[in-house]
C-alpha cells in the first residue's frame, strides 16, 4: 500500500483517503449424505481504496480495488478515474475520524482451536443431532472464517481487528411415504458450543418432519401468534433502523427522539440498545468501516425513543456524536414464560413484513405449530397480518433470551390482535 499512499499524497486534487483491507482465512468441509467429500482452505485479501475530493463546498468520494499485480501506472489511472467520479458527487462536507490507532480482537473461543480440530467438532455436533427416523442431512457444508480487518486513513487513523465466525449450511430432508421434503438451513455463530449446535440442527430436523406432516387449516384460526428470535430480530431491527442517523437525515423516520414507540402500552415495555459486541454474535466488531470505535447506546427506554445512532458522516450532519455503525441489537427481555393455552407458533416465514408508515406487520407462514389442548398440529399455507401499533402496545416478551446473528433479546414474543387467514 506504500505506492498508492505516496501517489495519493502527491495528488493535489485528493483531499483525503481511506484504506479498508480485509484478509479472510477459511477452512471448509463439504459432506454429502454424511460422507466427507471435500476439505478446502482459502486465504484471500481485499484492498479497497476510497478517495475523497472536496469541491465547491461539497465532499465527493469514489472507491476502487487494488491487487498485488496492480502497477504504479495502473494506480495513477485508478486514482484519476476515482477523482473524476468524486467530483460528480455533491455530499455535504464532513471530516474523517483522526489519530486513533490500535489492534483488537473480538472475543471468541474459536482462537483456542486449530481450524481442522474445530471443524471436526462442529461436524460431530451437527451429525449427532440426526435422531429422527426417516430424516437425514442430505448435504452439510461447514465454513470457519478468521477475518483480519484494517482501516487506515489520511488523518492518522490506523486500526486492525481480528474476528471469527462459522457458518453451517445444511439440507435437512424427510423421506415420507408420499414424498420427500427438503428445507434449507444456514446457522451462523462465533462461539463453539456443541449443545447449542446440536439443538439448532435438531430443531431444523424436527421442522422438516413437521413440514411433511403440515396441513392447511380448514377453518380460520383465531388465537395469539408467537414469534421466535428470527422474526423478533426483524421487528426490532426495523425500529432501530428508523432511529438511524441516515434515516433521520433523510427525513425518512417515523419515530422521533423523546416520543413514544408504544403509545398506550399494556404489555411488556420495549427496550433496545445498539452495541458493537454481543457474545456469540457473528456481527460483533470493535470498530466500523470508518475506523470508529464501537461502544453502545440506548435507543429505546420503556417504549420511548431516547437516542439516535449511526455513522461518522451522518452523525456530523445532524450535529450528533457519531456512534459508529453499530452492528448488534440487544432487546430487553420481558416477563412472559412459556406460552399456554391455544396459540400459533411461527417456525418459518417467507419474511416478516414490518411497515412503520402504514402501521402494518405480517407475512406468509411456511410452517407453524398450532397448539391447542396440549396437542400440536403443524400447519402451512396461511398468513398473518395486524396493526403494528396495536401489536407493539400489547406485545408480551419472553424472559428467556436467544442470539440470532446480530440480535440478542427475547427468544419469543406473544402477539395479540393478529389476523390469521
Regions found by a protein language model. Name each.
Residues 260-421:
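Dual-mode signal for accessory low-complexity, basic/Gly-rich regions
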Residues 1-277, 282-285, 412-421:
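Active-site bordering "gate/hinge" segments
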